[in-house]
Amino acid sequence: MNGVEVPAKIQKRIERLRQEINDHNYRYYVLSQPTIPDSVYDELFHELQKLEKKYPETITPSSPTQRVGAEPLKVFEPVHHEIPMLSLDNVFDEKGLRAFDKRIRQRLKLDKPFEYVCEPKMDGVALSLLYENGELIRAATRGDGYTGENVTQNTRTIASVPLQLRGNDYPELVEIRGEVLMPREGFAKFNREAEKRGDKTFANPRNAASGSLRQLDPRITAKRPLIFYGYLIGLLKGKDFPKNHCDVLKWFKDWGIPVISEIKVVGGIEGCLDYYEHLVKTREKMPFDIDGIVIKVNSLQVQAELGFVSRAPRWAIAYKFPAQEKMTVVKAIEFQVGRTGAVTPVARLEPVSVSGVTVSNATLHNFDELYRKDVRVGDTVIVRRAGDVIPEVVGPILAKRPKKAKLIKIPSRCPVCHAEVIKPEGEAVARCVGGLYCRAQLRESIKHFASRRALDIEGLGDKLVELFIQEKLIKDITGIYQLKKSAITALPRMGEKSAENLLTAIEKSKKTTLPRFLYALGIRGVGDTTARTLARHFHELDLLMKASIETLQEIRDIGPVAAENIHAFFHQKHNAELINKLIHLGVHWPQEKAVVKSEIAGKTFVLTGALKSLTREEAEEKIERSGGKATSSVSKNTDYVIVGENPGSKYEKAKALGISLIDEEAFLKLLKSKGVF
């Protein structure tokens, strides 16, 4: 009230109301033990709103009334995950689960069973909540695991997410990871009301949760019945990790973070199997969709020892429920061509609803599968959503097969570019050999070429790529570097500023590195790690392009299949011409230096926190060029952890495991002393 002091009695009442509302939220969402009816809760909330409106100087960011009110966003800002938000590996039967347990015990050299934590696998949207001194400062989606989207404004509208952690025993900085869900009851009610208004409905609760969280206007998200459950800690600063994962979940409850009540600590894999059988029988009684169980090693020390492999932890697995199945008819079998030339048969089906999703197309995986299952046009088939996600054809019902059911043959020519289709002996996949020249492979090739780990062309997204191809502005990947401002501004929703920004990003991408360029080419089986291996070995692109299969096979980590793929790619005339044209258009990179023998060679490094002089990717590239290996997670196999500003939980894990810690200055000295920097 413009300089008028707030009466002490009013200030006290406001603080009391906030405390009561937060306590009732805690009892409702965390304890599932509400003590007042909704009408009384609403009265308390409205009283607080009125007082804060009258005395706006009393409003704080963590007040329960401040969940909604921000202006709509124009775009979601990207968020880099200090610790990658990795997905889990899946198993679909008891054999797979026992193999997971066996791998762990062999790695740890243990014969006896040990503790696991079992929990329902929620079918929602992964979310990261970052709290500083107990206050929610950021919420981000998983994205690709490394970069997500900032959805803080929308997340603040979810009533089960505390804006301020309870108590005072929380760390200086903590990242709480979990899942955003839309309960079945809320989903059904939302769709009923949407139908009445003539608005779009959602196919299933997961799509509804995802769509609600990614609304640019938080006022829309606020109207959606979303709930959050925590299940993991990411970053942690100012507090030591507890002994076990179940202790982390107790922290969450104490701080006011909802945790699923069906979580159970079990002894050995037999306990996991019992838990799975119990949840199979009771899953429909749960208020939200689940699609399996998640099994985690309970000991955090053992988790750190096991570490990660590829994009998943070794210490956790998802055991999926059997997929739901329905019958329908195959109307046609068509062919799709992927980025690496794989020609995949796809069944076009009479639309059928499976697990709440309308399915009209289903993968047949490859021609070996097609013939093994003996699926024909006209067949009545069983369709299921594999892992409750990807639709696939299980097989035909032979008793219903019509006399004119048509068997499909492998095409001899690509249905798009008419290049030869080959199916090597012993391989299940048939492939178009057209490479970068194939128009069907063009769209995915361009998206891959422009991706963050490749040439990193900011602003060249999926929709824009589609538009450029549709308007015939890009006929192959070299077309990216021949785009004109006048042609771009002539397109819908592309003004001068947008065109200038895109052209600037394209120009910037011309200066790259050999590993990035090799990865960008999309050679089958050549990921960013293999690309770095090839660049370190050959140093020059010309030498790599001329290498024989035998020479390639001599390189560590390059097997016979990868060697054949690399050799075949560079010996396709179209591919060689496109590479030369890209170089002629200005794509260039510094010559790769030979790996110098140093303290870095043969060592495994992990980075945590922000470096002042280098980006994370630049630091990783320099480590690789020096013969070292850069990984994203700390394990007992890590040699050094490079500690930057505001280090995360990797720092704490490294200390616990006794791993050598070096700061940025020491790391730079290592590089400079060997002429790498």
From Swiss-Prot:
E.C. code: 6.5.1.2
Assigned GO CC terms: cytosol
Keywords: DNA damage, DNA repair, DNA replication, Ligase, Magnesium, Manganese, Metal-binding, NAD, Zinc
PROSITE patterns, sorted: BRCT (PS50172), DNA_LIGASE_N1 (PS01055), DNA_LIGASE_N2 (PS01056)
Gene3D superfamilies named among the record's database cross-references: 5' to 3' exonuclease, C-terminal subdomain, 6.20.10.30, BRCT domain, DNA ligase/mRNA capping enzyme, Helix hairpin bin, Nucleic acid-binding proteins
Record field: transmembrane: none
Residues given in the record as NAD(+) binding sites: 38-42, 87-88, 119, 142, 179, 296, 320
Active site: 121
Cofactor: Mg(2+); Mn(2+)
GO molecular function, one term: DNA binding
Catalytic reaction(s) noted: NAD(+) + (deoxyribonucleotide)n-3'-hydroxyl + 5'-phospho-(deoxyribonucleotide)m = (deoxyribonucleotide)n+m + AMP + beta-nicotinamide D-nucleotide
The family this protein is said to belong to: Belongs to the NAD-dependent DNA ligase family. LigA subfamily.
Protein name: DNA ligase
Biological source species: Coxiella burnetii (strain CbuG_Q212) (Coxiella burnetii (strain Q212))
Phylogenetic placement of the source organism: Bacteria, Pseudomonadati, Pseudomonadota, Gammaproteobacteria, Legionellales
Gene name linked to the record: ligA
